[in-house]
């Protein structure tokens, strides 16, 4: 699997482009690249990739980002019933609209791509995906405790119900949620 990823990465076409940027931005980018132990070119490619693949869609769609601490506080202020209702409400509307906006179709692949992108970009947790035959499995590890798992379970169930019109099989622990669909 790793050699396949390397071959795909090496087969991507690249192009050369030149930009003029403010010196303070250059210093900031060089510092960040050094801290991440990557080249300035790699960092720039990541920034451009994030913009093209995600940020422009998030902005056009009106997404609002929230810190992990604020999200944790929100969850802690709600009882279990309200957490489930909140998660189902947002999980059954915005994801479907966003997926259609970005990918133009509702398919297991576009749903999986959305979940991975959304969870990792929005800070809900680290996401691992597998697909065997016709079953996709999404595992999310997070830092929000039991109330976070309750929210994420209801959120993921609502996404699958509203997009694929089927039930997902969801398992949860205090800091992880696994969904099969």
PLM region spans:
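Short Lys/Arg-rich basic patches
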Residues: 1-23, 34
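Short, basic amphipathic alpha-helical segments that act as recognition/interaction helices
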Residues: 38-61
